[in-house]
Amino acid sequence: YTGVSREYLIRHGLKIDDDDFRQEVLKPQGKGVSRYDGRMTRPLLEPEMDEIKKGLWDDATADRYDTYFYAALTGDLLPRLNVKLDRNYIALTNFYKNWDKDAPHGTTAEQLRNAMTRRPGMRTFFANGWFDLCTEFGYVWHTLDHAGLPKDRVCWKGYKSGHMIYIGEENIHELCADIRSFIQGKDPSK
């Protein structure tokens, strides 16, 4: 079960585009799924814009959290840390509407493999949210299986979260404990 309509699958030769999936899976209910957390939805208010921009211009998770992060960084957090920026902070959400989703994307797997080959003591910990549709765990698994990384020095763990694993009391405590464990030389996935 894919969640998208039979018509969509036939029209696209059984291939499901990531952006299309988020727009199609709850389309019958008039909703789009968040890229950053598949548990969050928003109404498909502007079908034409939703189709053209594939939801990058308006995301349920970004709508919920970006304002707080922006306010914390510009109004409270930076002064407490005694950080003074010589330029204005520009919120990422301002770029969504102009995002070029067709721009070529590279992979960092080769660079990671090279770095780990050159540094025999280097270890890598992948932490992913199960509901993250932005950096999907399937890509991590593919990288782990095909990038030639030294498997004895790579760990992976999934969390009950979206893209921002650190949101939520339970998640942040688990992630912090796992990072501490990793730094101490242990495998947090075990």
Regions found by a protein language model. Give the residues of each.
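C-terminal subdomain of alpha/beta-hydrolase-fold enzymes, centered on the catalytic histidine
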Residues: 1-189
